[in-house]
């Protein structure tokens, strides 16, 4: 996502290297590069023109800041204007003073509207808001069944009257059912079409008039580029929407939709879909996306993902096990699964500042390594996972694990060596000391005469089973120790 745009923008900063300050002459080339980058990302031409004009005015009017080079100053100006372009701040979902809150979902066929409805329902559940989904798409085969299946997956009820009922009547009765059940929010999944047609728009307008939604959200496909912005504008003019949900933002998209929707339609992006899983829906934060576009990472979203995936009680238990040197392979596999719940490895790494330069090949290699590790740990017995030292001292156990996991004995030995080193390092960091120099750590595996130093103990090369006896100091001739 946005990789090509980020790389092109980086070329723009390079144009200002070695300059003392921003001037009309030296900024010209950088602005041309930014312009080319945005157009290549399929940002609307009028949006690009306005953006470049605003950046130029701010850059030429900026005061010289001591200790900040022109390139850094220019990046900050571009960042501020990107945030401004996309809407400055997150616009939350509406919430009616008196329940139920009614959210009308609209969009063309193939944009992921029905899935987005379920994703939004799950998001509301996580916010402790009860939801009811209403299936009014009576035209597309299996649309009602799809919503019911998704509802079962996320444990959210679905209201429908079958495929022969009138969509407007289904929507009306769905809202009444929500009132009867005391549900907080109603999500009405309307029919999509392959194109905008008068019949669809008239039906949507009638549903809107009857249910009087608090939010009318248009689901658009990010991969359609600036066309998504034009579609949002058309829907807003004819129906009156309050925001958009941008789907497939994790795909091979150039970013034009995210940068054009607010400016062209005047309506905010409220959520973005970042994957196929039903959990893969995030509130849209313009500042965070601007950071990612400029290769600054997105630490806040990463922290939020971690908070969702990881239980605080589990973290405390894990911390205690690290400090007590009882961290084992069961804990290690649990950590790996926590990470999987947070999303793909590539997606997580790109949220970390400075990790954007990792190639897709590097990420793929890392994902394969994680799978190999999980396969080897899965081939261990319960006793071996609880006591990794058993494997270090037993070649026969390592051979059995290698055969069971489909990997070599060398791979298993390497896993155990790296695990032992990692466990020691984690304990040292947890206790606030430095590797190899912590009081009372001599008996820890791998410590020896420094971090993983000393001669290998029983088992295999590279592993040290215990601290061993301290080496005797040789007497020096002459003055000895002064």
UniProtKB/Swiss-Prot annotation:
Entry's PROSITE patterns? SRP54
Q: Which UniProt keywords apply?
A: Cytoplasm, GTP-binding, Hydrolase, Nucleotide-binding, Ribonucleoprotein, RNA-binding, Signal recognition particle
- Which EC numbers does the record give? 3.6.5.4
Show the ranges annotated as biased composition (Gly residues): 452-468
Q: Which InterPro entries match?
A: AAA+_ATPase (IPR003593), P-loop_NTPase (IPR027417), Signal_recog_part_SRP54_M_sf (IPR036891), Signal_recog_particl_SRP54_hlx (IPR013822), Signal_recog_particle_SRP54_M (IPR004125), SRP (IPR004780), SRP54 (IPR022941), SRP54_GTPase_dom (IPR000897)
> Which residues are listed for GTP binding in this entry?
107-114, 189-193, 247-250
Bias (Basic residues) occurs at 469-482
Q: Where is this region: Disordered?
A: 380-413, 452-482
Reactions this protein catalyses: GTP + H2O = GDP + phosphate + H(+)
One GO biological process term: SRP-dependent cotranslational protein targeting to membrane
What are the recorded GO MF terms, alphabetically?
Answer: 7S RNA binding; ATP hydrolysis activity; GTP binding; GTPase activity
State its location(s).
Cytoplasm
The Gene Ontology CC terms held by the record are: signal recognition particle
Q: Whom does it interact with, and what assembly results?
A: Part of the signal recognition particle protein translocation system, which is composed of SRP and FtsY.
What's the family?
Answer: Belongs to the GTP-binding SRP family. SRP54 subfamily.
Q: Which NCBIfam families match?
A: ffh
What the protein does comes down to:
Involved in targeting and insertion of nascent membrane proteins into the cytoplasmic membrane. Binds to the hydrophobic signal sequence of the ribosome-nascent chain (RNC) as it emerges from the ribosomes. The SRP-RNC complex is then targeted to the cytoplasmic membrane where it interacts with the SRP receptor FtsY.
Record remark: domains: Composed of three domains: the N-terminal N domain, which is responsible for interactions with the ribosome, the central G domain, which binds GTP, and the C-terminal M domain, which binds the RNA and the signal sequence of the RNC.
Annotated protein name in UniProt: Signal recognition particle protein
- The species this protein was found in: Synechocystis sp. (strain ATCC 27184 / PCC 6803 / Kazusa)
